[in-house]
Swiss-Prot record:
One of its GO terms (molecular function) is metalloexopeptidase activity. GO terms for biological process: proteolysis. It comes from Arthroderma otae (strain ATCC MYA-4605 / CBS 113480) (Microsporum canis). Zn(2+) 2 binds at residues 271, 304, 430. This is Leucine aminopeptidase 2. The keyword Calcium does not apply. The active site is at residue 303. It holds the Pfam family Peptidase_M28. Residues 124-218 form the PA domain.
Length: 495
């Protein structure tokens, strides 16, 4: 009773000073958030209306996408800001920043046969260069992986172990005039070099099947490749949107995030309109409750160009401010059409990549969400290839949900989750077909309820959660092994 009277007194004082929003007037009388009630506020119609809104933003402009710095993305962040500001429940801000945008297209022809290829973003241009193809050894991550005759040649490199940028730089150092990276799992390959670097060679990605075929041809004879890469670059102003509950303990912050941008090819509705709307729907539902711990939501810009927005945000916080963030939950692609229910492997039991202390407990909480309903789930590699990367590098516990990108579903997974074996989790990943029709309604609804479940648990109490590790730096680069994807920038952007 004393606490209630104190809260009411604070509210009345604020009213007398004329500085409190209408929603906050009701704060002392709202029930404390709990998992069941918050989940029950999640409605499929709201989720589908939200992703439709994002598609409308994209299609209102000639580019038909929501790439950072573009009109469709600006409409997206303005809408998120205005919707949450209108609730009166959150302190909302837009965080401006400038990043280098790149658009690249590639054409690759080998021995007279055209191959499907994607230029790596930030690749140097190549004007119809023609040269003999040579093979890099051991994934091309070290200078010794390149044969002496690499100079003046185009080099074929298998994906894995190190970043695309490292491979391209090593190829450039070896005086290759071009680099082609082929996938190490079935399917096409698109990605980024992570930024401009004068060491980079012009670089494109191709499928595993095409890459293996080229490697076989090189081993048995000469292969001549013609490669064309067109690249454009432009500095663009863009924004993160950050919203934090006005109530709750602001020294114990629960943070959730999703990236709000798309690739150039389409509107990006599963990747990552699904996560964007998932956490927004939870944020709106949360306004019906009070919280013990403050909840902060982040919508990150420029994820598709190298996790730029989330990295900018984390870098803007000193150790004292970041220490207030007790955990970070990431949601990137939660409506994949051929989905699998996947939880980031916080304890490292599946992929030997553990998160900071507390990441295991986040994984176990999501496991309980699925287990309590008898719903199957599996771990996904916690490699730091989505927006949680900047957080775990600074020792913030992290976790989240993911329903799959371009990795092909196995027969065993099809038995477990349904869907079609031999087909990617999202066959429209990074394509123009990533529209509202690409969303699996059951997946986005279930996983958004999972977001609500975790939000309610941690917003009400952190009892039993490990003491927040000291803010510091840690290496999250997965070297020496190849892992399936764990998100959007996740699977194919860097490595």
């Amino acid at each position: 009773m004393k606490t209630q009277l104190l809260s009411l007194g604070v509210a009345l004082t604020a009213i007398s000073q004329g500085v409190i929003a209408e929603d906050a007037l009701n704060w002392p009388f709202k029930p404390l958030v709990n998992a069941d009630d918050l989940q029950n506020k999640i409605k499929l119609k709201d989720l589908m209306a939200g992703v439709q809104k994002l598609q409308d933003f994209a299609y209102a402009h000639p580019e038909k996408n929501r790439v950072f710095g573009g009109a469709g993305h600006k409409d997206t962040v303005d809408w998120i800001y205005n919707e949450l500001k209108a609730t009166g429940y959150y302190d909302v801000k837009m965080q401006p920043q400038v990043h280098l945008w790149s658009h690249a297209e590639a054409a690759v022809n080998a021995n007279g046969k055209d191959l499907t290829a994607s230029a790596m973003s930030y690749s140097p241009p190549a004007d119809k260069i023609t040269a003999e193809l040579v093979l890099a050894k051991n994934m091309g991550c070290n200078a010794t992986d390149y044969p002496e005759g690499t100079k003046g040649k185009i080099v074929l490199i298998e994906r894995g172990v190190c970043s695309f940028g490292e491979k391209s730089a090593q190829a450039g150092d070896a005086k290759a005039i071009g680099a082609i990276v082929y996938n190490n799992v079935p399917g096409s390959l698109a990605g980024t070099l992570g930024g401009l670097d004068n060491r980079h060679a012009p670089t494109a990605g191709i499928s595993q099947a095409d890459g293996k075929n080229l490697a076989s041809l090189v081993a048995s004879g000469k292969v001549t490749v013609t490669m064309n890469v067109i690249s454009k670059f432009e500095n663009r102003t863009t924004w993160n949107v950050i919203a934090e509950t006005k109530g709750g303990d602001h020294n114990n912050v629960i943070m959730l995030g999703s990236h709000s941008d798309s690739v150039d090819a389409g509107p990006g509705i599963n990747d990552n309109g699904s996560g964007t709307i998932g956490i927004m729907t939870v944020a709106k539902a949360l306004t019906n409750f009070k919280v013990n711990n403050a909840v902060r939501f982040g919508w990150w810009t420029a994820e598709e160009f190298g996790l730029l927005g989330s990295t900018f945000y984390v870098d803007s916080l000193d150790d004292r401010e970041l220490h207030k963030v007790k955990l970070y939950l990431n949601f990137d692609m939660i409506g994949s059409p051929n989905f699998a229910n996947q939880i980031y492997d916080g304890d490292g039991s599946a992929y030997n990549m553990t998160g900071p202390a507390g990441s295991a407990e986040i994984e176990y909480l999501f496991e309980k969400f699925f287990d309590d309903q008898g719903i199957p789930h599996q771990p996904t590699a916690f490699t730091g290839r989505s927006d949680y990367s900047a957080f775990i590098k600074r020792n913030v516990p992290a976790g989240g949900l993911f329903t799959g990108a371009e990795v092909v579903k196995t027969a065993e997974q099809a038995k477990l989750f349904g869907g079609e074996a031999g087909v990617a989790y999202d066959k429209n990943y990074h394509g123009k077909g990533d529209t509202v029709d690409n969303i699996n309604k059951g997946a986005i609804y279930l996983n958004t309820r999972g977001i609500a479940y975790a939000t309610a648990q941690y917003a009400s109490s952190l009892r039993g959660f490990p003491t927040r590790p000291k803010t510091g730096k840690r290496d999250v680069s997965p070297r020496g092994q190849s892992m399936p994807g764990g998100g959007c920038g996740h699977h194919s952007v860097f490595m």
